[in-house]
Amino acid sequence: MTDLKITLIRSAAHSLPEQRKTVKALGLGRVNSTVVLPDNAATRGALLKIAHLISVEEINK
């Protein structure tokens, strides 16, 4: 099972409201904040919406 380490690298301040809500729903707040989430379809779908704002690394358990 793998997890995803997601880091916000660009601010969501001037993004669309839906993208700002997605950033907040993933648990990201400020630039350079990082969360570790499970690798599943729901997470991947959310990441596709804000791919231009984040960096993603896979973490093997």
Swiss-Prot record:
Keywords: Ribonucleoprotein, Ribosomal protein
CDD domains found in the cross-reference section: Ribosomal_L30
GO terms assigned for molecular function: structural constituent of ribosome
A biological process term (GO) from this entry: translation
Cellular component, GO, one term: large ribosomal subunit
HAMAP family (UniProt xref): Ribosomal_uL30_B
Subunit structure, as described in the record: Part of the 50S ribosomal subunit.
Family to which the UniProt record says this protein belongs: Belongs to the universal ribosomal protein uL30 family.
Protein name in the entry: Large ribosomal subunit protein uL30
Native source organism of the sequence: Lactobacillus helveticus (strain DPC 4571)
Gene assigned in the entry: rpmD
